[in-house]
C-alpha cells in the first residue's frame, strides 16, 4: 500500500453529471489491464522461448555479416524485445476492447442503469481517486441473483484508500439483505490480491479467449457477509 499520508476522503454516489466519468474511469482501467496481460505473456516460458530463438537467429545473422560488439548486441536485444512486446499488444488490446463492448451492452455491468450503483472516492473534495460498483441482485451483469461488485478501481498512488471503497460496497450489499456478495474480475486485475485479502474465494475460473493459454481468466469471487466482522445481518 502507498505511504502517502492518509487524508479525509469523500465516498458517495455519483451525480447525474458524473455518470459518464464512471464509464470513462472503468474503461481506462481495462486498458491498463491489457498492458498487464501483454507483460504477462512476454514473460511466459513459451513466448520467451520463441523470443530467444528469434533473437539468436538475428544475432548469428548479423554476426556473420558485420560482426557483433557488446553495444550492437545490446541494441539488438532492445529492438527485438520492443518488436515482441508490440506484436502482443495488439491482441491484448483487442480482447479488452471486446470486454469493454460487452460491459457497455444493455445486459452488461456498465449498462446505463447500473452507473447509479457505483461509488466514487474523492480526495480534497475534487480529485477522483477510485470507483467501485455494487450491482443489486437483479441488475444487468449481476452474478446469479447476488449483489455483485464490478470495476473496483483505485489510482495506485492512493491504494491505501482502496478498502474504504470496498467497505462501502459491502455495507451496501448487506443493506440489500444479502448474506453473500459476488465480484466479477479478471486475472489481470491489480485489485485481485486485495479481494483475496478480504477473504473472497473463486467460484468461477474460466478461459474465454485463446489468450487464456497465457493465463488470462475470467473470475467470479464470493464472500460470505455473515462471517465478516462488522457486517452482521441486520434484517
UniProtKB/Swiss-Prot annotation:
GO terms for biological process: endoplasmic reticulum to Golgi vesicle-mediated transport. The chain crosses the membrane at residues 41-61, 71-91, 129-149. It comes from the Eukaryota. The keyword Membrane applies. InterPro entries: Acyl_CoA_acyltransferase (IPR016181), Pho86 (IPR024297). Coiled coil: none annotated. One of its GO terms (molecular function) is L-cysteine-S-conjugate N-acetyltransferase activity. It is found in: Membrane. Keywords: Membrane, Transmembrane, Transmembrane helix. The keyword Transmembrane applies. It is a multi-pass membrane protein. GO terms for cellular component: endoplasmic reticulum; endoplasmic reticulum membrane. This is Uncharacterized protein C12B10.02c. The lineage of its organism: Eukaryota, Fungi, Dikarya, Ascomycota, Taphrinomycotina.
Amino acid at each position: 500500500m502507498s505511504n502517502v499520508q492518509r487524508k479525509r476522503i469523500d465516498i458517495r454516489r455519483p451525480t447525474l453529471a458524473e455518470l459518464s466519468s464512471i464509464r470513462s474511469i472503468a474503461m481506462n482501467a481495462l486498458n491498463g489491464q491489457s498492458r498487464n496481460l501483454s507483460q504477462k505473456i512476454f514473460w511466459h516460458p513459451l513466448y520467451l522461448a520463441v523470443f530467444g530463438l528469434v533473437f539468436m537467429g538475428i544475432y548469428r545473422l548479423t554476426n556473420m555479416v558485420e560482426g557483433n560488439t557488446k553495444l550492437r548486441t545490446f541494441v539488438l536485444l532492445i529492438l527485438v524485445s520492443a518488436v515482441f512486446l508490440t506484436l502482443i499488444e495488439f491482441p491484448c488490446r483487442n480482447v479488452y476492447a471486446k470486454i469493454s463492448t460487452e460491459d457497455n451492452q444493455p445486459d452488461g455491468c456498465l449498462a446505463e442503469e447500473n452507473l447509479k450503483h457505483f461509488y466514487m472516492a474523492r480526495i480534497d473534495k475534487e480529485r477522483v481517486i477510485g470507483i467501485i460498483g455494487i450491482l443489486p441482485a437483479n441488475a444487468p451483469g449481476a452474478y446469479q441473483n447476488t449483489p455483485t461488485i464490478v470495476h473496483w478501481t483505485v489510482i495506485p498512488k492512493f491504494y491505501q484508500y482502496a478498502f474504504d471503497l470496498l467497505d462501502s460496497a459491502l455495507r451496501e450489499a448487506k443493506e440489500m439483505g444479502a448474506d453473500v456478495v459476488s465480484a466479477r474480475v479478471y486475472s489481470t486485475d491489480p485489485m485481485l490480491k486485495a479481494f483475496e485479502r478480504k477473504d473472497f474465494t473463486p467460484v468461477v475460473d474460466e478461459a474465454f479467449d485463446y489468450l487464456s493459454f497465457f493465463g488470462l481468466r475470467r473470475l467470479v469471487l464470493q464472500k460470505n457477509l455473515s462471517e465478516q466482522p462488522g457486517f452482521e445481518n441486520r434484517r
